[in-house]
Structure formats: structure tokens, C-alpha cells
């Protein structure tokens, strides 16, 4: 039986600075002792997106104090912690350096093992923390940097079934919002405007719908939104609402096709898993209610459980990083050495083909 374990988690991959202390008992159950997150929204909102240098500086200024807060709220000291888990990628390299170097320093000073965690693995394993989910299951990761459909076979065993060939879904939301003059972050702003819009007004494209492969594409949709806005400029509030509603509908129908095919593939490959199969949604875009409703209906139709962890655990947080470290410890994975380096790109499925899209970000993890 795996012994009781406690770990300090650190997350600095983008624009949230976070620290958490999490326990895992012998039966595999989780207890979150503390969860501290500091958002950098105010620092980046004026620029309409995350500025890497500003993000890195903010992590430097905040991280030490957040770690102290996490330990204090958990009522533990470093002596009571069994290991350190820090995000090592993928993400913005400046932020990753801050978090990983801090984790290394703590591990060295306190004599604790270090686990360098893939941020995507944190998202992929969160449902085991919140719902005690058994392997295998599917994860749809939708965020500002990633849109991936991942098969989770076990800890450290991941297959990427689909990914974006250009823009991530969260990126498409943010750029659409900026185009329409809406505030950052764009996802919530677009969702709010869409509530009062006519989704039938614009027939936006649904890229890759009908194709057998399970990849995604959103750059063409973004271009169609720009063209529609230019055609009817200047835009009234109702025009903006209608564009947002039509944009969301196109995304919902795209996901319905892409994920629906993924669910069917899962049932073919795992015809009898012993329990109802599950689809987990994670990432900041998972907060979108229309997206959740679409996925819930799709799961109901196909006989799947639909699992959406609490929003605080869908967006970037250190709890999931600590939990991923605990899962790795429990399965006997050796800790990392102190010469481990951060990686701005770090595919969760090391065997997956690198896709080259047409977005500004180049190769997609």
C-alpha cells in the first residue's frame, strides 16, 4: 500500500502565480490543505493579452510570499512536506524559470525530492483528484495555449488523439474579443455578449467538421469573424452580440463533431471498461456554459460521464501540479535531478506527430 504523502506544488507557467499544499492518503484520496493563486489580470489587461516579460517579473515579485502563505494556511513547515512539485513546461519560459528555479532551491535547501511537472499532465489528472476517476478516460483540454483531446491510460501514459493545427480555442476567443473591442480576457466577454445575440445571423465556418482525424482548427473561423465585422462596420452593440453568438455556435458545432468522433473511437477501443466511460473538460475555456452544455448533451447521447472539475481547478493552479507530483510518487516514478530544465514546448504525448499550423505560434505541442 502506498504511504501517506504530502507535497508542495508551484505553478508559474503563464499569468497566474500559485502555490498549494496537498496530501494523498494510503487509499489515494486527496486533501487540499491550501491553495493560493494570484492573478496577473490587472497587469496584462491594458495590452489585450499576456506580456511574457511582465508575467515573469510578477512571478518573481509574488512567488516567495505565496509559498509562505500556502505553508502557513496548511499549518505545516517545509519539514512536514515530503516533496516539491513545480511546473517545468509547457508555457512562457520566463515564468517557468522562476517557478522551477524556486522549486529547485527549496528542494536543495530542505533536502526534499523534486518533481518537474508537465502542466498538461496536471490538467489531465485533475479529475482523479476531484472525482476519483479510474483509467482510462478522455480529456478535452481547452485553454489559451492548447486545444487537445487526450487519452489518459495511466500516470505518464498519454495519447494525443487530436490537437489544433493553428490557434488554440482560448486564443480564438481572445482575438475575437479584441477585434470586437471587448475587454481582456476575451472568453468571458464574448460569452456575456453572446447571451443577447442572434446565433442565426452569421453562418460562420466550422473547420475540419466531417473529417475522420480528430484535430481542430480555429484560424479560419477567426478570419470569418473579422470579415463579417468589416462588412457591417461600424458595429452596434447588437451587431457585436450577434457576432459573438454566431461565433460560439460555430465553436459548439465544431466541438460536437470533433469530440463526438472521439467518443466513438473510445468506445471502439475500450468496449468494456467495467464502468461508464468518461470525458473530462479542463482549461480556462471550460468555464464557458454553452461549451459545457454541448459536451454534456454529447456525453448523454453517447453514454459517457461528463466531468468538469470546479472552475478553480480548471484554470491554472498549483493544486493540480502538487497532485500530479503525488500521483507520480505513488506509482514509483523517480524524482527529477536538480539539473532538470524548463521547456516552453513539452508535448504530453512524446510520440505524437508535431503539427505545423499557420498561426503565429508555429509548431503545436
From Swiss-Prot:
Compartments, record wording: Cytoplasm
GO terms (BP aspect): tRNA threonylcarbamoyladenosine modification
Residues that hold Fe cation according to the record: 119, 123, 316
Gene3D superfamilies (alphabetical): 3.30.420.40
EC number assigned by the record: 2.3.1.234
Highest taxon above the source species: Bacteria
Cofactor: Fe(2+)
UniProt keyword Acyltransferase, yes or no: yes
Cofactor remark from the record: Binds 1 Fe(2+) ion per subunit.
One Pfam family linked to the record: TsaD
Residues given in the record as substrate binding sites: 141-145, 174, 187, 288
Keywords: Acyltransferase, Cytoplasm, Iron, Metal-binding, Transferase, tRNA processing
Reactions catalysed: L-threonylcarbamoyladenylate + adenosine(37) in tRNA = N(6)-L-threonylcarbamoyladenosine(37) in tRNA + AMP + H(+)
CDD domains from the UniProt entry: ASKHA_NBD_TsaD_bac
Keyword Metal-binding: yes
GO MF, any single term: iron ion binding
Residue ranges of coiled coil: none
GO cellular component, as recorded: cytoplasm
Similarity annotation: Belongs to the KAE1 / TsaD family.
Role: Required for the formation of a threonylcarbamoyl group on adenosine at position 37 (t(6)A37) in tRNAs that read codons beginning with adenine. Is involved in the transfer of the threonylcarbamoyl moiety of threonylcarbamoyl-AMP (TC-AMP) to the N6 group of A37, together with TsaE and TsaB. TsaD likely plays a direct catalytic role in this reaction.
Alphabetical list of PANTHER family matching this protein: TRNA N6-ADENOSINE THREONYLCARBAMOYLTRANSFERASE, TRNA N6-ADENOSINE THREONYLCARBAMOYLTRANSFERASE, MITOCHONDRIAL
Full protein name: tRNA N6-adenosine threonylcarbamoyltransferase
Organism: Rhizobium etli (strain ATCC 51251 / DSM 11541 / JCM 21823 / NBRC 15573 / CFN 42)
Gene giving rise to this polypeptide: tsaD
